[in-house]
């Protein structure tokens, strides 16, 4: 179970690479949008599946 848990969560850098943006963009989205980010301790973590669904929903476009 620990292996599956670890595989599901990615950090800011991996999220940026996954979405093709910079780490600064991810941090701005955390502040300004409803990006599915989870704060675990001092770190922001993401699930790839939640990020993909967020992008597909069109919510990643900042108006």
Residue ranges and their predicted role:
Residues 15, 45, 62:
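Short, electropositive, low-hydrophobicity segments enriched in small/polar residues
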Residues 19-45:
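Major-groove DNA-recognition helix of helix-turn-helix-type DNA-binding domains
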Residues 1-28:
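Polyanion-binding surface elements
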Residues 14, 31, 41, 57-59:
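Extended rod-forming repeat segments used as scaffolds/tethers
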Residues 49-63:
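A short, Lys/Arg-enriched interface patch at domain edges and termini
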């Amino acid at each position: 179970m620990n292996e599956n848990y670890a595989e599901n969560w990615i950090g800011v850098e991996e999220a940026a690479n996954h979405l093709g943006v910079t780490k600064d963009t991810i941090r701005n989205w955390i502040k300004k949008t409803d990006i599915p980010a989870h704060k675990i301790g001092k770190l922001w973590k993401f699930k790839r599946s939640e990020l993909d669904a967020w992008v597909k929903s069109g919510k990643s476009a900042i108006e």
